[in-house]
Amino acid sequence: MRKLTAVNSLLKRNNYLLPRHGSSQTAAQRTSSVRETETETKLPKMPPFNYSPPPYDGPSTAEIIAKRREFLSPALFHFYNTPLNIVEAKMQYVFDENGRRYLDAFGGIATVSCGHCHPEVVNSVVKQLKLINHSTILYLNHTISDFAEALVSTLPGDLKVVFFTNSGTEANELAMMMARLYTGCNDIVSLRNSYHGNAAATMGATAQSNWKFNVVQSGVHHAINPDPYRGIFGSDGEKYASDVHDLIQFGTSGQVAGFIGESIQGVGGIVELAPGYLPAAYDIVRKAGGVCIADEVQSGFARTGTHFWGFQSHGVIPDIVTMAKGIGNGIPLGAVVTTPEIAGVLSRRSYFNTFGGNPMCTAAGHAVLRVLHEEKLQENANLVGSHLKRRLTLLKNKYELIGDVRGRGLMLGVEFVKDRDLKTPAKAETLHLMDQMKEMGVLVGKGGFYGNVFRITPPLCFTLSDADFLVDVMDHAMSKM
């Protein structure tokens, strides 16, 4: 009786009519139809959130697209078949022009660390704006030195001197220049599949053809990528590091300026370096007179969960650390931190950055550090990220389309392949899944050289319920393929 009542209720709720006399539909077909309808109604449910945005009265998506095409660079591109018009954001959620809420699992490309519009960061910026937002570092202001002091307290060894920039590209440009000035050498080693920026020197260090223009990019040698999934030596980090030795011996004078590498490759598809690689590579480079640069633009600021800085999980201490993105929670800010000895090379000439270290940005950065500490977001990234990775791994066991699940904390990657043995990139399937997940309220990023990797880098306030919702949506979308 209860089953019949439930079926009748389902039929009524979906405006189904029982077949009239003479209908060709069989009882089995009717039961199948009910089951399909019941399945369709069981879409994953987004966790509750105590905020609703006010009505949006700005330009429509169509108007924005028209202006973008007319006035902005044609190099700009967007995700999704139907572009998303984001008009407001709170913590781990963003809202479109219709007030619809989405779970942001991309975090502005690993940039939103504390959460969208975190009140502590917003209040610090507003407070500073009411005092002074910019003058010049030629005058004194306590915000830049206060933030620098707090920042170096998170770093090991003799990493005690800070230079502020506006972006990760700027930070890496400065770091590479300092390495060359300090050593008196020009050659730098970076990794294949890496991304370090798109200016003159950093484009040379970047090693993906789809991010490189045909301009002069001299003095950089790209070593074999220590990729445990696609690499030729599997997870043997020391074997990969031998290529750094060979590059130095056969491609340079035997002396180099340095090595630059991400702790986890971000744009390259959330690739964790093979265990043992960085200690071996650092040792080889230092024996050749070079310094070691850790690019922490994406993996820094507690994102990997187990450590505040990504390089710490490899057991190394760099000579120079670069950072951006999560440092300001969306405010344009970057930095280079190095030793007093290396920092001294910039005193040979005048070095200046107009906006680097301005009061507003450094007030934001200082607030980010406070929030990360007070709200224990590193611990949260470890807890939620570990849970999310476990659930994604279970999903891999369910679907052949998933070739690899990797990463640490809330910096995770899911690589899609058409064939697990051949590892043929499933680029079209990746795009389709992204679109389907967006329709169900989940936003993820995309990366990897072949464009077949989900980049999952949400704000660090991401919850266990958010993680479950993401996986449930992904599971539902994949079940329909």
From Swiss-Prot:
It is found in: Mitochondrion. The keyword Cell membrane does not apply. Residues 1-31 form a transit peptide. Its cofactor is pyridoxal 5'-phosphate. GO terms for molecular function: alanine-glyoxylate transaminase activity; pyridoxal phosphate binding. Belongs to the class-III pyridoxal-phosphate-dependent aminotransferase family. This is Alanine--glyoxylate aminotransferase 2 homolog 3, mitochondrial. It comes from Arabidopsis thaliana. The lineage of its organism: Eukaryota, Viridiplantae, Streptophyta, Embryophyta, Tracheophyta.
